């Protein structure tokens, strides 16, 4: 019986699952938004949110524990130097999962996973007046 067994198997053995979660969490922290299937996104939340909570208290022990989970020095550095301080006042709920349709090949439900307070890229909008002024000169 499967009673009280939490987590999805996702058609993978335990080592493959662990490596997939590690890679997805590292990509999420590196890029601050990723696109994946909906079940993977929901499971990623169980892996990534405790790491951000751990990063809120910067210590050597917590950095080592995070490195043990992620195995990427660059990502661990960003986690503790940028993301931990950013979410210092937030008591949880660091990720947002947005459904984004279905994958064309197999119709799997897809989702965007993003960090809640991530800075959005600034798009430079040029005014038409500035362009006209530049053309007349």
Curated annotation (Swiss-Prot):
Gene name tied to this protein: rplQ
GO biological processes: translation
Superkingdom of this protein's organism: Bacteria
Record key words, sorted: Ribonucleoprotein, Ribosomal protein
Q: Which organism is it from?
A: Alkalilimnicola ehrlichii (strain ATCC BAA-1101 / DSM 17681 / MLHE-1)
What GO CC annotations are associated with the protein? cytosolic large ribosomal subunit
Q: What is this protein called?
A: Large ribosomal subunit protein bL17
Q: InterPro entries recorded for this chain?
A: Ribosomal_bL17 (IPR000456), Ribosomal_bL17_CS (IPR047859), Ribosomal_bL17_sf (IPR036373)
- Subunit structure of this entry? Part of the 50S ribosomal subunit. Contacts protein L32.
Give the family this protein belongs to, as stated in its UniProt record. Answer: Belongs to the bacterial ribosomal protein bL17 family.
GO MF terms here are:
structural constituent of ribosome
| PANTHER family found in the cross-reference section | LARGE RIBOSOMAL SUBUNIT PROTEIN BL17M, RIBOSOMAL PROTEIN L17
Lineage of producing organism: Bacteria, Pseudomonadati, Pseudomonadota, Gammaproteobacteria, Chromatiales
NCBIfam families (UniProt xref): L17
